[in-house]
């Protein structure tokens, strides 16, 4: 598992400090003695380090700490900057990269407070003292009056708060999202208090009371669409007495059931009059309907509890707002609507398709208003490629509302729509220049616009239409007419659910406005969205292509012409009485309205207002309400619909096909009854309401009763919020990392528990394990087999390597005999004597002969018997055992013949350092001769006799006086003190001079033969390795795992302080430990990812991909694995120390002579492990279990291991078959496939060779998330892609692991990256032809896929057979690699979880690209982070650098920011900020590479004071992992 650390910083910052090598324990420094050990002591041959190495490691740790401190300081500084400027977006980016809010802010940046004019001050003063509706022309500065009023209210509010009064806030209400952005930007530029802006698309309907309370506490002004405040009031998130000012923008909308009117009726008028907020309304005209002007205006005053006011000095206003010159453009009478040739073809064949009816109606009407050319071209929009999925989905939805599955007639209709699209694509459209193709109305517009735009001009024009289609078609037409200086654009409203190609986003609206301001567009074809409130810059030509219907439309659209010399043109049909009457009507109405407003006396009292209010409320009282007393939250007929929608959406996480409330309204006895149907998982499924006279009333009544029922069942809380939550997984932000560099002290087993079993008793039977030696070349002397006898049978151990003589590689083979050896007490005595004699003669240890305390016995093997004999007794050399039992040593007097002294093992009884093998008699030397000069110096160098003799000074004199000075001098081989034969000799050990000359009399001749003694000298290394195997197997047994010994030990072996840091100078390397866990951990990590992915997939059918990722993260994170390992005490089985000459001796014996190592054993029973190491061992055990196989399936034991180490109910499988048995087939999978799905299955089988039993699975695998599930009727591919991703990882890792047994995990990871990269998988998707089957709902995506497919196919054609052609192309759209992974997931599930299906796919379609992996050696190095690391390390020779990342958390719903920094010698050379650690690090690396681009090594070292070239070794770049 990659390391991950998240730390708190300054109370609100989480930093990430990654892959930091562990710091040394500076308080426990080791001192290495270089002097000769004192007489009589065993010396240590361990060379674990020196002072220079410790100093180097201390420096590395210090550098890491300094870098971490530097980064945390930087992160804190940047966090303050980011949070302090959170309300001020970065505006220096191109418009295309800015958010909508930033676009608005950029346009208003620098627009400071304007000087109020006299009429504005006049209205402001009136608004301070009473509720006021300001009626002023568009462009006269109504918003500025609102700003002045807000400043006044806020000032008083701050005073009230200081005096202890409850806080109140101001609301600026708007009628559209567009205005919310615009007005919020204006207020932020003019107020010094926090201003928030909200609209429905932000998901405010799902916010909790706590979220709202936070917003109310932190903002003085809130700009929002009116329905948001209405819902807050009804849900009692805020009360009317907590509001000090209500500003209604475009106040003329306050009528009927508009949210403005409902706020007044349902909340404002119900509040205590003394606690109501001030009201300020703004409008260009107080009415927007036809009828009695005075009556409508008076009613508006009543509804808003306000007085209409305008300036008493209209001349001042006219100086500011100049009226445009009004013109009437007359066009000839239009022809009646008629059917064009294309219309006739489509009507005849497809006129019965309901989804196309709106298009038929428009095109028929357009033939008259716009002309046949525009009418026909409308079909190109309606049946474009990006619209077809919408139409198809609409057909499916309608069909399935009647029956399920989709009937064949619906499928046929879908096919017919596609056929219609093909007809339109192949249709030859006439040129608009052909006579008769354009209507007289359009021809006139063309002529007029040519006059304005045929020469260079500063004219800016807006052409208003009533219909979105008309604006779009005019834009399309004038884009092709080639009027020299006309730059057309289109601005239409946002409408959800538009299925005929007219939909736009808020962002597209703003971009159009931005381009209009800048002049990039100078003629805007717009609908009413451009009439009202939008701050469109001055333009000098406004054309009403379609006439206004009301006074407000006339006033608003005329107000767009603000230039000093503007023209306002109304296009009217010649001889059309209705058009002429409308012109007169609006002008007279405007005069009457102005007269009414201007003649209002200042102190006028609105007579009859109480009765008017009563009549308003009476209509509401006829409708029921339901109030929750605890909070005051109110349920009304209108709010019930929103509450039910919110409740239904809260069940979305249950993966409903359609998480929405369904209303079915049916006629009944001259009235209507509505049935409410809630999503399937709702405990209350709905009800049927009471009859009502209108459909809308029936629907509201049923919704109201349903909400009451939900409340009764406690499914709605005290604020009418659902008790369910469409929640993000609870652990999405959990701190699941552990500190990779933190070390703790843990107990460590030094001996297996096997040795303690039955210890203290004399055995009657023993089990034999024969130990043999197979050298790679002849040794200097024979090494005879020995037998290890134990109370219990030992497992079969793998062979392993030791290094004998001068590093001759020798294989140690152990063979465990099945049958037990029954022994007598005499035989046990022989065995005990021999074992104790080995410790005495060979290792200078004298133990009390207590055979019951021995954990094992060592015996010589019989050389004459076959190794295959199963009888342990016949394998043992009992004659030699008897000889050794009877003779403690061989007296030299028994061998008067000098030849008898040759090929003996002799030892110094006083000094354990001196053991020899005798080789020859040297007749040229005598005992009295001085030792040859090449011999190592000893204390006494007077003679060879004196050189050989050890012992005290007094004993020496006596011995020398009586010894035989005529005895021969023997040439011998000094046995090295080296005990760790598991590793090759160190240089120090090689430098030891082993040739020596001694006299035999001061020494003892061992009764143990030379060939047995030679084998016994290897016994410490052998028993150390066997101990390690046994301890590792015990560790596996604690998890109930049956693992092969070699893999078990490898999984538990950590041979350095930083084993997990590959290709890095290893710290405190432990020699001779064999393979460490890193490769197994890499393999286990991959299997863990796959196993948990499968388990989550089968156990949680309702979870989405995000749930899967978060839940898998919780399972596989180092923190979880560490906690499991801690609980099961796996740390004690971990082998973190190499061979120790102190701990190999058996426990429990009584030492009589020799160095006592018990203190050393106690000290070495603890070891320091990083927390990450403990977690890594868990993954390595999974890898070991995988290699060990299973009883029925190769993965069985690994599955069991995953369950053991994750310790979670989310993974309970004990074998592979448990996955299949746990999987409940979802309904969509088992439903009968339709014709499309059967055809898809056949085509994909032809391409890939696998036949799906459930074609709907394949359908799901190829369904993009953009494709509406209600249309597709199968889930999108995200769940299957999640599963397939892990399967692909596993099959690729498995292939590399076995093909390259000697490659380290970093190499394997880097080359796996190529195999699973999006770049390769995208190319593979195109190669296999899968891209043509993707079902999506995105026009840009279609274009991206087409362009990529063309590029990758061209690259393959030009590659001349090279398999890496995909490397040179651009990255594919992500949907293509996702398709491949989803296909694998689908095939895997379809095959009942047969991994063979994944392997077959890999062998057939993937393996051929990766036979030669050297091609991809540089693949990973192209990554900016890897490239930076290589440059710093290899080119500059620098090792003191790091790349760190830290996350700055924000409030719920906010955008996460992550800062990454490259630090070189405590200097931050580059930074990058992004939404994730991964991309932040890429940005920081790219910037760092840019900084270093032309910098040579000398300049680098001078600039950053780098002296790393003088240091030993290199350290890794601290790159960590993505947050």
UniProtKB/Swiss-Prot annotation:
Cystines in this chain: none
Stretches with biased composition (Polar residues): 24-38
Residue ranges constituting the PAZ domain according to the UniProt record: 879-1007
Record bears the keyword Flavoprotein: no
Chain positions recorded as Mg(2+) binding sites: 1281, 1378, 1381
Cofactors that this protein relies on: Mg(2+); Mn(2+)
PROSITE patterns: DICER_DSRBF (PS51327), HELICASE_ATP_BIND_1 (PS51192), HELICASE_CTER (PS51194), PAZ (PS50821), RNASE_3_1 (PS00517), RNASE_3_2 (PS50142)
Record-stated family: Belongs to the helicase family. Dicer subfamily.
Name this protein carries in UniProt: Dicer-like protein 1
Lineage: Eukaryota, Fungi, Dikarya, Ascomycota, Pezizomycotina
Gene coding for it: dcl1
């Amino acid at each position: 598992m990659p390391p991950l650390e998240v730390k708190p910083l300054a109370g609100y910052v989480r930093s990430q400090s990654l892959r930091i090598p562990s710091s040394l324990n500076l308080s426990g420094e080791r001192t290495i003695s270089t002097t000769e050990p004192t007489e009589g002591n065993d010396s240590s041959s361990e060379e674990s380090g020196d002072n220079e190495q410790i100093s180097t490691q201390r420096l590395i740790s210090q550098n890491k700490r300094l870098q971490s401190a530097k980064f945390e300081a930087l992160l804190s500084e940047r966090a303050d900057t980011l949070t302090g400027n959170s309300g001020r977006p970065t505006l220096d980016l191109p418009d295309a990269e800015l958010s909508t809010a930033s676009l608005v802010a950029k346009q208003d940046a620098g627009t400071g407070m304007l000087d109020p004019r006299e009429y504005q001050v006049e209205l402001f003063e009136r608004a301070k003292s009473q509720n006021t509706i300001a009626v002023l022309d568009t462009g006269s500065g109504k918003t500025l009056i609102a700003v002045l009023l807000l400043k006044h209210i806020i000032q008083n509010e701050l005073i009230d708060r200081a005096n202890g009064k409850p806080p109140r806030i101001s609301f600026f209400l708007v009628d559209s999202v567009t205005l919310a952005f615009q007005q919020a930007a204006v207020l932020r530029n003019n107020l010094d208090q926090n201003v928030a802006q909200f609209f429905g698309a932000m998901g405010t309907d799902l916010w909790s009371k706590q979220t709202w309370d936070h917003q109310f506490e932190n903002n003085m002004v809130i700009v929002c669409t009116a329905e948001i405040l209405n819902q807050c009031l009804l849900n009692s998130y805020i009360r009317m007495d907590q509001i000090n000012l209500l500003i209604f923008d475009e106040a003329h909308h306050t009528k009927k059931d508009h949210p403005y009117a409902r706020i007044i009726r349902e909340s404002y008028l119900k509040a205590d009059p003394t606690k109501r907020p001030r009201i300020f309304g703004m409008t260009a005209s107080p009415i927007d309907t036809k009828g009695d002007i005075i009556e409508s205006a008076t009613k508006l005053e009543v509804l808003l509890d306000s007085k209409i006011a305008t300036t008493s000095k209209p001349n001042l206003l006219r100086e500011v707002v100049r009226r445009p010159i009004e013109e009437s453009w007359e066009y000839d009478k239009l022809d009646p609507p008629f059917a064009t040739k294309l219309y006739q073809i489509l009507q005849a064949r497809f006129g019965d398709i309901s989804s196309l009816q709106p298009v038929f109606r428009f095109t028929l009407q357009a033939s008259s208003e716009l002309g046949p050319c525009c009418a026909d071209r409308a079909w190109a929009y309606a049946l474009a490629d990006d619209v077809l999925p919408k139409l198809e989905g609409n057909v499916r939805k309608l069909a399935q509302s009647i029956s399920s599955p989709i009937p064949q007639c619906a499928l046929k209709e879908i096919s017919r729509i596609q056929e219609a699209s093909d007809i339109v694509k192949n249709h030859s459209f006439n040129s608009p220049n052909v006579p008769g193709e354009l209507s007289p109305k359009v021809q006139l517009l063309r002529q007029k616009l040519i006059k304005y735009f045929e020469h260079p001009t500063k004219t800016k024009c807006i052409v208003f239409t009533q219909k979105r289609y008309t604006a779009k078609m005019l834009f399309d037409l004038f884009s092709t007419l080639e009027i020299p200086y006309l730059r057309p654009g289109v601005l239409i409203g946002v409408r959800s659910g538009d299925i005929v190609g007219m939909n736009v986003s808020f962002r597209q609206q703003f971009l159009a406005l931005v381009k209009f301001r800048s002049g990039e567009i100078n003629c805007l074809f717009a609908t009413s969205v451009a009439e009202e409130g939008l701050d469109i810059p001055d333009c000098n030509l406004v054309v009403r292509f379609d006439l206004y219907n009301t006074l407000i439309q006339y006033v608003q659209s005329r107000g767009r012409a603000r230039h000093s010399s503007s023209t306002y043109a109304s296009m009217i049909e010649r001889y059309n009485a209705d058009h002429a009457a409308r012109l007169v009507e609006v002008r007279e109405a405007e005069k009457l309205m102005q007269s009414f407003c201007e003649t209002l006396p200042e102190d006028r009292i609105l007579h009859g207002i109480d009765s008017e209010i009563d009549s308003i409320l009476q209509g509401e009282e006829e409708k029921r309400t339901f109030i929750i007393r605890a909070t005051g939250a109110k349920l009304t007929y209108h709010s019930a619909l929103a509450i039910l929608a919110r409740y239904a959406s809260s069940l979305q996480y249950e993966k409903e096909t359609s998480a929405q409330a369904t209303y079915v309204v049916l006629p009944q006895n001259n009235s209507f009854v509505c049935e409410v149907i809630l999503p399937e998982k709702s405990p209350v499924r709905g009800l049927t309401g009471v009859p009502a006279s209108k459909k809308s009333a029936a629907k509201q009544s049923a919704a109201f009763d349903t909400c009451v029922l939900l409340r009764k069942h406690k499914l709605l809380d005290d604020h009418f919020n659902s008790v369910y939550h469409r929640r993000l997984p609870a652990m999405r932000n959990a701190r699941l990392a552990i500190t990779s560099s933190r070390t703790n002290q843990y107990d460590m087993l030094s001996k297996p528990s096997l040795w303690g079993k039955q210890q203290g008793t004399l055995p009657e039977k023993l089990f034999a394990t024969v130990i043999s030696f197979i050298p790679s070349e002849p040794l200097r002397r024979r090494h005879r087999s020995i037998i290890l006898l134990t109370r219990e049978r030992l497992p079969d151990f793998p062979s392993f390597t030791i290094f004998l003589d001068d590093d001759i590689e020798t294989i140690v083979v152990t063979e465990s005999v099945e049958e037990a050896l029954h022994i007598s007490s005499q035989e046990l005595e022989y065995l005990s004597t021999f074992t104790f004699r080995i410790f005495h003669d060979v290792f200078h240890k004298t133990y009390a002969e207590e055979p019951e305390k021995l954990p094992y016995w060592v015996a010589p093997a019989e050389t004459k018997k076959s190794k295959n004999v199963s009888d342990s007794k016949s394998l043992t050399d009992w004659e030699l055992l008897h000889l050794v039992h009877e003779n403690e040593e061989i007296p030299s007097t028994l061998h008067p013949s000098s030849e008898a002294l040759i090929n003996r093992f002799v030892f110094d009884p006083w000094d354990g350092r001196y053991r020899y093998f005798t080789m020859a008699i040297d007749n040229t030397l005598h005992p009295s001769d001085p030792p040859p000069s090449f011999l190592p110096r000893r204390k006494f160098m007077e003679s060879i006799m004196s050189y050989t003799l050890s012992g005290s000074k007094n004993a020496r004199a006596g011995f020398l006086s009586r010894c035989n000075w005529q005895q021969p001098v023997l040439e011998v081989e000094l046995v090295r003190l080296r005990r760790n034969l598991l590793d090759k000799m160190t240089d120090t050990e090689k430098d030891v001079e082993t040739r020596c000359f001694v006299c035999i009399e001061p020494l003892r001749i061992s009764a143990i033969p030379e060939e047995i003694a030679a084998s016994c000298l290897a016994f410490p290394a052998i028993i150390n390795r066997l101990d390690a195997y046994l301890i590792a197997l015990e560790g596996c047994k604690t998890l109930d795992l049956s693992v092969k010994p070699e893999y078990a030990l490898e999984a538990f072996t950590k041979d350095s302080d930083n084993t997990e840091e590959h290709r890095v100078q290893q710290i405190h390397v432990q020699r001779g430990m064999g393979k460490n866990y890193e490769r197994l951990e890499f393999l286990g990590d991959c299997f863990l990812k796959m196993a948990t992915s499968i388990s989550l997939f089968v156990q949680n059918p309702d979870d989405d991909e995000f749930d899967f990722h978060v839940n898998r993260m919780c399972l596989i994170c180092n923190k979880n694995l560490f906690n499991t390992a801690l609980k099961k005490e796996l740390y004690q089985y971990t082998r973190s120390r190499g061979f120790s000459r102190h701990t190999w001796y058996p426990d429990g014996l009584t030492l009589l002579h020799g160095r006592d190592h018990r203190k050393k054993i106690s000290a070495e029973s603890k070891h320091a492990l990083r927390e990450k190491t403990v977690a890594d061992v868990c993954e390595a055990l999974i890898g070991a279990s995988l290699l060990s196989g299973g009883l029925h399936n190769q993965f069985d034991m690994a599955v069991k291991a995953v369950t053991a180490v994750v310790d979670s109910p989310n993974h309970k499988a004990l074998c592979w078959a448990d996955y299949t048995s746990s999987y409940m087939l979802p309904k969509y999978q088992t439903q009968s496939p339709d014709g499309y799905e059967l055809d898809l299955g056949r085509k994909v089988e032809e391409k890939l060779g696998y036949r799906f039993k459930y074609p709907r699975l394949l359908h799901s695998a190829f369904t993009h998330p953009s494709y509406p599930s209600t249309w597709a009727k199968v889930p999108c591919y995200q769940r299957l892609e999640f599963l397939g991703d892990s399967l692909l990882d596993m099959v690729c890792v498995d292939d590399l692991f076995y093909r390259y047994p000697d490659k380290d995990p970093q190499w394997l990871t880097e080359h796996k990256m190529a195999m699973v990269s999006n770049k390769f998988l995208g190319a593979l998707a195109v190669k296999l032809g899968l891209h043509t089957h993707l079902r999506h709902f995105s026009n840009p995506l279609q274009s991206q896929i087409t362009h990529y497919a063309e590029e990758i196919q061209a690259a393959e054609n030009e590659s001349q057979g090279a398999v890496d052609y995909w490397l040179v192309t651009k990255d594919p759209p992500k949907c293509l690699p996702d398709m491949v992974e989803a296909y694998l997931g689908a095939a895997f599930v379809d095959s009942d979880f047969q991994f063979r299906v994944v392997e077959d796919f890999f062998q057939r379609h993937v393996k051929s690209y990766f036979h030669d992996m050297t091609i991809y050696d540089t693949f990973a190095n192209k990554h900016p982070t890897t490239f930076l690391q290589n440059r710093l390390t290899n080119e500059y020779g620098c090792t003191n650098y790091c790349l760190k990342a830290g996350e700055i958390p924000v409030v719920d719903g906010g955008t996460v920011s992550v800062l990454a920094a490259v630090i070189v010698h405590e200097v931050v050379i580059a930074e990058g900020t992004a939404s994730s650690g991964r991309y932040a690090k890429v940005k920081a690396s790219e910037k760092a590479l840019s900084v270093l681009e032309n910098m040579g090594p000398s300049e680098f070292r001078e600039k950053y004071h780098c002296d790393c070239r003088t240091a030993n070794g290199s350290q890794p770049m601290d790159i960590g992992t993505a947050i």
